[in-house]
Amino acid sequence: MPTPNSVVGPYFDELVVGQVFDSAPRMTLTEGAAALHQAILGDRLRLALDVELAEAVTGTPGLPAHPGLVTDVAIGQSTLVTGRVKANLFYRGLVFHSYPKLGDTLSTTTRVVGLRQNAVREGRAPTGLAALRMTTTDQHGRLVLDFHRCAMLPMAPGVVDTGHHDDLTTIGADEVSTDPAGSWDGAAFRARVPGPHFASELAGHRYRSSADVVSSAPELARLSLNIAATHHDWRVGGRRLVYGGHTIGLALAQATRVLPNLATVMGWQSCDHTGPVYEGDTVYSDLHIERVSPLPAGGGVLDLRSLVFAVGAEGGDDRQVLDWRFSALMF
């Protein structure tokens, strides 16, 4: 029987705070990658689909990369650390510092910033939580993303105690203010796109989306350089898990159907995976507009909360799988 391959990634007990992983392949955002990403998720974000509109609004040539494609690639590049992941528990503090265009090349550095061993449970292999900080830059060194996530990783066979007991509750909780879309022309958007447009009266509204089947899950993971084994090999946990960004991507696609004039995603305040998703599930979301913040030049920022539910292909009760708070620009 072949021996386990260490290329899969480190065990929890092999990590130390301060460790850096920066050897993932850089990835150029191509039209082909954008097309496949859109085909899998069906997102209708206008600025990522319409180059004439995008150039008029951003004032620069070229088509912006879809923000979901950017985050998927950044997360995928960080899976050098989490090839053995059992579950990804949360994302925190994801902020766009700049918006790449198609043709830009992304690289991501991942740092271990906290480690906490889980309590050992009888009959279960020991695990621990690794808090990671990802910073993504483009080919010019411009900062694109800065965010944290928490992954549950197994411990190596025979390891009982690592001594890691960091408090992970505040990691990634600091608020960061950026304005990468500050120079965009909202009037140009409104002149070219029919309403409804941003209005302060949107605050407090709630919407139930239509549903989407989860399909092409391994393809999305491969596209985004995500090498976590649980997304590719059912033997890891008895059933292949869908990459969490796939669920997030479908939730964003549903948000763009509910609010078709969203311009872009500005950041994620929090994102908690509350249950597993499997290929063939059907997912839908309840979208809450929790707060609106008008901008001086028109338009505004929506603070949104998406609660996502899944229904198995075989039926059964609906189950909540995602609680995602994010901010979006609307003109």
Regions found by a protein language model. Name each.
Residues 71, 91, 134, 185, ...:
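Aromatic/pi-system hotspot detector in well-structured domains
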Residues 12-15, 28-29, 64, 94, ...:
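Hydrophobic beta-strand core residues of beta-sandwich domains
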Residues 55-65, 69-115, 247-290:
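Hydrophobic beta-strand-centered segment that forms part of the acyl-chain substrate-binding groove
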Residues 1-19, 102-183, 279, 286-331:
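HotDog/MaoC-like acyl-thioester-processing domains
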